Amino acid sequence: MTNVFTIDAFREEVKKKYEPVTIGISEDVTVELKPLLKLGQKAREAVVEAVKEVEDIPDIDEDDEEAEELVDEYSLRICEIVAKVFRLIATKPKKLIAALDEEEDPRIRAELYATVLRTWMVETQLGESRALAELIDKFGGAILSDLSEYHGVDLRDLFRDEDPLSPRYVLNLVIHLPKTGAFYAERRGGQQYRGWDEDRYALADIYDAVQAGNHILLMANRDPKKPKPKAPKAYPRPDDFEKTTPKPGSFAAMVVAAKKAAREKREREEANAE
């Protein structure tokens, strides 16, 4: 994976950490644009969707005869979409939008809207914020636990008003969390996977191989008058547990219990017959 940090990147991280995204409208009026991670989940989703909508607007072919009309139409559409974002992230959205709308030329106005949006995206690390927000929404508890256990980092510091952790820094830590931790276990399906890395699976395979070898040895040297030794069971793996363990009280659980009782009864009868 590409290294996220360079010396220049560290320098920018330190500088930006203390600088809010502030847009000056006049000498005495400023508007702050909140980072994505400080929005509620629904607001975050709406912002991400709006940004994606802007990015998906196709380029205009300058050779197209209708290009002039399309440019104005696209410009108005861009302003409309970006205004939705400003209403969610700006502390004074009406003043910001009114200031931008003072420009009469729709093309220049659209460029102004887009420039403010791009500035916010860069300064707040939107890409990393979006990825991190999605992970926190799905696996927040596990990430909180792992960051504290492995790095001594409190995830809540990401949301502090003063000296917050940067999204890029936290995302980098999350990406490189150990595979044996709670985060990767949750991504794979649940905490039953915790601790199960390549080494654990290899040990389970070795255990099964040794048990199988012992069983073959017992079968080759057994007394034919005595019952056959039971075949060894495979070492339980989280994948098997997830597939074969039905919910207590469910119909599947009752079927499993009935089959187990019938099998045990049959084994007792065979043992008594011999």
UniProtKB/Swiss-Prot annotation:
One Pfam family hit: GP24_25
Coiled coil: none
Claim: S-adenosyl-L-methionine is one of the keywords in the record: no
Comp. bias (Basic and acidic residues): 236-245
Chain spans, region Disordered: 221-250
Leader sequence residues: none
Subunit structure: Interacts with tail assembly protein Gp24 and tape measure protein.
Function: Promotes tail assembly by creating a scaffold for the tail tube proteins. The tail assembly proteins Gp24 and Gp25 would wrap the linear tape measure protein to create a tail assembly scaffold. It would allow polymerization of tail tube protein during which Gp24 and Gp25 are released and therefore are absent from the mature virion. The tail assembly protein Gp25 is produced by a rare -1 ribosomal frameshift. The ratio Gp24/Gp25 is important for proper tail assembly.
Protein name, UniProt field: Tail assembly protein Gp25
Source organism of the structure: Mycobacterium phage D29
Gene name, Swiss-Prot/TrEMBL: 25
